[in-house]
From Swiss-Prot:
Record's protein name: ATP-dependent Clp protease adapter protein ClpS
Gene name of the encoded protein: clpS
Family annotation (Pfam families): ClpS (PF02617)
Subunit: Binds to the N-terminal domain of the chaperone ClpA.
Family designation: Belongs to the ClpS family.
Length: 104
């Protein structure tokens, strides 16, 4: 805010408009490995990224064939939480599945 004196010895406050930027977005990416079963990857994509079975299977095949697949794009906090949930679930199930986040 700027203080601007007017001609009658009183003060007028002038509010500067703040421009809000949308939050940075992050891709959540699954990485391929030679040990995690394909069906487990499909289940992870369905459970944590709310994809239907067909879409989850397409993402799993992309991970398998290309080495990586994007599961979704989220704000930083949500992406970070999803990465942590996926990695924790994979470790508890005994799988080395890797999940990372990258700026979109």
């Amino acid at each position: 805010m700027a203080i601007i004196p007017d001609k009658q010895d009183s003060t007028v406050l002038e509010r500067k408009e703040q421009k809000l930027k949308p939050p940075s977005m992050y891709k959540v990416v699954l990485l391929n490995d030679d040990f995690t079963p394909m069906e487990f990857v499909v289940m992870i994509v369905q459970e944590y990224f709310k994809k239907d079975r067909e879409t989850a299977t397409q993402i799993m095949l992309k991970v398998h064939r290309e080495g990586r697949g994007v599961c979704g794009v989220y704000t930083r906090d949500i992406a970070s939480t999803k990465v942590e949930q996926v990695v924790t679930h994979a470790r508890q199930a005994g799988h080395p599945l890797q999940c990372v986040m990258e700026e979109a």
